[in-house]
From Swiss-Prot:
Stretches the record annotates as Beta(2)beta(3) 'finger-like' loop: 156-166
Modified residues (S-nitrosocysteine): 116, 123, 217, 238, 241
Comp. bias (Low complexity): 1-11
Protein name: Egl nine homolog 1
Entry cofactors: Fe(2+); L-ascorbate
Subunit structure comment from the entry: Monomer. Interacts with ING4; the interaction inhibits the hydroxylation of HIF alpha proteins. Interacts with PTGES3 (via PXLE motif); thereby recruiting EGLN1 to the HSP90 pathway to facilitate HIF alpha proteins hydroxylation. Interacts with LIMD1. Found in a complex composed of LIMD1, VHL, EGLN1/PHD2, ELOB and CUL2. Interacts with EPAS1. Interacts with CBFA2T3 and HIF1A.
Superkingdom per UniProt: Eukaryota
The protein's Enzyme Commission number: 1.14.11.29
Binding residues annotated for 2-oxoglutarate, in chain numbering: 298
Catalysis performed (reactions): L-prolyl-[hypoxia-inducible factor alpha subunit] + 2-oxoglutarate + O2 = trans-4-hydroxy-L-prolyl-[hypoxia-inducible factor alpha subunit] + succinate + CO2
Native organism: Rattus norvegicus (Rat)
Length: 338
């Protein structure tokens, strides 16, 4: 029996002029055995964390409105490479049928995700849960869509006549315990396990909570989400985690690529929204990104993880208001994060 070939991975495009040997941003590790968009900034009703919390800080007047990408050279997916921060093949031997064992969560976290994030700020894991589980998640998401649970994605600060000029997705927020969302809950628990194993090793962050899962659908009518930053104003979110559900996705035909523009680099990373692919990246201004127009139905599930210290500061800022005067809140007026 043969091990499965290493999957494709996103690579940072070389700067204009084609400098040889440009570094890859992220890579792809195989997780199972067989890139969304960040969206509306979550408010307190969307959080899963001990205690109660504020919504994000309102973008300031200095913040430029979302803008379209300047159009540097297009990045492409390439065969997996080696080394920390690059693609990591699964280990642990082969199953009798030749399938590769899933990489244990602890090993995946410490030997791949941590070095990849700390080096590049972007990390891709392919075949995260396996085909069967990924299919079950997709079935649950499509059922939510078919029963009218999705609403138009909203913006925190309205700087356009229509939010659809900026983002064209439809979303719903899921805790993971709702009837019919059990496998989505399993996905969220699996994400939590990875982050727990990374605890204390992702930059200087002390991660202690997350949002609910934002399930997003681009309906395939050519809409996307213009270039933006998830957390431009210190609302507490430090890591964006996106899971994709799109089988047999062909970006050349259907578009829908998530393009990330790492801060201070004349390079970008293109992440195709492939089935059972998990993506991590820093949520702050280091990673402006956009969802390019999608011409087929495109599903993704996004969770944001909180840094404890920044989240606490954001709560104080929210409760004291603009002038530093504490705002009195009625009982239960701020939703708990659990």
């Amino acid at each position: 029996p043969r091990a499965q070939p290493a999957p494709a991975q996103p690579r940072v495009a070389p700067p204009p002029g084609g400098a040889p040997g440009a570094a890859r941003a992220g890579g792809a590790a195989r997780r199972g055995d067989s890139s969304t968009a960040a969206s509306r900034v979550p408010g307190p009703e969307d959080a899963t964390q001990a205690g109660s919390g504020p919504g994000p800080a309102e973008p300031s007047s200095e913040d430029p409105p979302p803008s379209r990408s300047p159009g540097p050279e297009r990045a492409s997916l390439c065969p997996a490479g080696g080394g920390p921060g690059e693609a990591l093949s699964p280990s642990g031997g082969l199953r009798p049928n030749g399938q590769t064992k899933p990489l244990p969560a602890l090993k995946l976290a410490l030997e791949y995700i941590v070095p990849c994030m700390n080096k590049h700020g972007i990390c891709v894991v392919d075949d995260f849960l396996g085909r069967e589980t990924g299919q079950q998640i997709g079935d649950e998401v499509r059922a939510l869509h078919d029963t009218g649970k999705f609403t138009d994605g909203q913006l925190v600060s309205q700087k356009s006549d229509s939010s659809k000029d900026i983002r064209g997705d439809k979303i719903t927020w899921i805790e993971g315990k709702e009837p019919g969302c059990e496998t989505i809950g399993l996905l969220m628990s699996s994400m939590d396990d990875l982050i727990r194993h990374c605890s204390g090793k992702l930059g200087n962050y002390r991660i202690n909570g997350r949002t609910k899962a934002m399930v997003a659908c681009y309906p395939g009518n050519g809409t996307g989400y213009v270039r933006h930053v998830d957390n431009p104003n210190g609302d507490g979110r430090c890591v964006t985690c996106i899971y994709y559900l799109n089988k047999d996705w062909d970006a050349k035909v259907s578009g829908g690529i998530l393009r990330i523009f790492p801060e201070g680099k004349a390079q970008f990373a293109d992440i195709e929204p492939k089935f059972d692919r998990l993506l991590f990246f820093w949520s702050d201004r280091r990673n402006p990104h956009e969802v390019q127009p999608a011409y087929a139905t495109r599903y993704a599930i996004t969770v944001w993880y909180f840094d404890a210290d920044e989240r606490a500061r954001a709560k104080v800022k929210y409760l004291t208001g603009e002038k530093g005067v504490r705002v009195e809140l009625k009982p239960n007026s701020v939703s708990k994060d659990v």
